[in-house]
Amino acid sequence: MSDSFEATRTTRRRRPLQALTGLLAAGALVAGALAAASPAAAAVTSNTTGTHDGYFYSFWTDSPGSVSMDLNSGGGYTRWSNTGNFVAGKGWSTGGRKTVSYSGQFNPSRNAYLTLYGWTQSPLVEYYIVDSWGTYRPTGTFMGTVTSDGGTYDIYRTQRVNKPSIEGDSSTFYQYWSVRQQKRTGGTITSGNHFDAWASKGMNLGRHNYMIMATEGYQSSGSSSITVSEGSGGGGGGDTGGGGGSTGCSVTATRAEEWSDRFNVTYSVSGSSAWTVNLALNGSQTIQASWNANVTGSGSTRTVTPNGSGNTFGVTVMKNGSSTTPAATCAGSGGGTATPTPTPTPTPTPQSCSAGYVGLTFDDGPNTGTTNQILSTLTQYGATATVFPTGQNAQGNPSLMQAYKNAGVQIGNHSWDHPHLVNMSQSDMQSQLTRTQQAIQQTAGVTPTLFRPPYGESNATLRQVESSLGLREIIWDVDSQDWNNASASQIRQAASRLTNGQIILMHDWPAATVQALPGILQDLRSRNLCTGHISSSTGRAVAPSSAGGGGGGGGGTGSCSVSAVRGEEWADRFNVTYSVSGSSSWVVTLGLNGGQSVQSSWNAALTGSSGTVTARPNGSGNSFGVTFYKNGSSATPGATCATG
């Protein structure tokens, strides 16, 4: 392992916990050539791999002296304090379809994972099966769910380009993720179930390299003590659960609260409003309760049809020896007692806003599994919200970004891939925010004016970057703790503390948040509080503007509206394309920032060059472009439209 290779690894990381070390990977690659050794149960503090007590182990850190691992029988005790990045664990030099059992303690502060982790080659893939985490739950492009070992995992895929891997220090490869919806520390991971679920979504593995039950941390502190062993099974068939479809509709399952004897599941149907869903219970499972649908049948099969409450329903399943989520299939013909015609969405009743407005915020979207459910609930209740997507998720889910815009929610910026920005250089901060601005402009056609720093961490340098992009920093007054495994009732209780102008932190991905949202909106209505948007001037929740939709990319008066999409950018200038809708006879007023000036324009007649600029049609249609000189400000000029 050369010094140059280690130096490359030390500086390469941009997203916390996104990809493991080239140094660790290189060590694992040659693990088969290592002589079997049995180190004493002493603290390991330097980068190494080997065998101990019959298990392969790996230890890597870029902050020597701040992390140690004691090699104990069957597992290791790891301690870390204010470390940069590390990963440590025990497992097998050659992975595969193993049933892995583990137990112990995992006590992170801030950013860490407890994960079954490994690599394959041909194709080169880095994979994670995450059972618990600290302050950040990993996300990516949402691919579906898999139910295994008593829990439901969200499946994500991400890609790394020119990054260290087990094959060298400049590889391009996919990462596959299964992230448990409810945290746990201890149990069984049937890896074959995850491998099969990934394969069903085109996420194929190759020849297995190493596999370890790992603790990984980044810029955090904590401790873990994990004992690992291999079970008797080989992984079995894929227990993908979660949904299926036929003849025009599909159904997805979201696991919710769980107790020792029972658990809740929410099923959501798409593609038809006249549907029949068949649930296949496992073993001796029974249905204790249901809501928002008619449920009939006995034995191992239940038939579910609409009852006028929409296309989402829930059941409480008594385990009776099985914790597996009942599989669901959908038929769009309705059949039997299904509602013969689509059930209309209820028109929201007028609401008093005499107590003021509050800001519901959802971070880390959009996600295929939950975003549409959140938007559907908001629409049903005549409510709105502010969303803070990451640039990575925005780029990977353009249709959901359009869904955000069409639903009229306010769209802010949440960085490209959720790093600890305060530990980055100013240029890296600038890149994180600028790339996200561009991704949102390209996918939703709006320009954010709000920014929420990941983890709520900020400093003077970051605020300077925000200001240069015309962004207002938004934190929160109430933390729902949904990121920390809070239940739906706990999230709802947190929202009950909101008062006029205040903002609550929630996230796009937790199933419990989706389940809590209807109750939150009902509670606000009963208190004469309305949902609003966040003012970029004051940072407080206010009545939503009539323009709706985005985060400050445009506005309208009369019968036209205008949106802005940021284009090319250079050191001294940038391009913006403005698109007008609603009228062919329009006047757009542009508000330039600071010392900005107009260098050139196309497809419209412009009057003025600094301060306030007016644009009118010149016969070239309803889209026009402008090149602005920055002169100290990179913020996109705001635009309003009036018919003329």
From Swiss-Prot:
UniProt keyword NAD present: no
Catalytic activity: Endohydrolysis of (1->4)-beta-D-xylosidic linkages in xylans
Signal sequence coordinates: 1-43
Alphabetical keyword list: Carbohydrate metabolism, Glycosidase, Hydrolase, Multifunctional enzyme, Polysaccharide degradation, Repeat, Signal, Xylan degradation
Domain GH11: 44-229
Region (Linker ('hinge') (Gly-rich box)): 231-245, 548-556
Organism domain of life: Bacteria
Listed PANTHER family: ENDO-1,4-BETA-XYLANASE A-RELATED (PTHR46828:SF2)
Family: Belongs to the glycosyl hydrolase 11 (cellulase G) family.
The name this protein goes by in its record: Bifunctional xylanase/deacetylase
Source organism of this protein record: Cellulomonas fimi
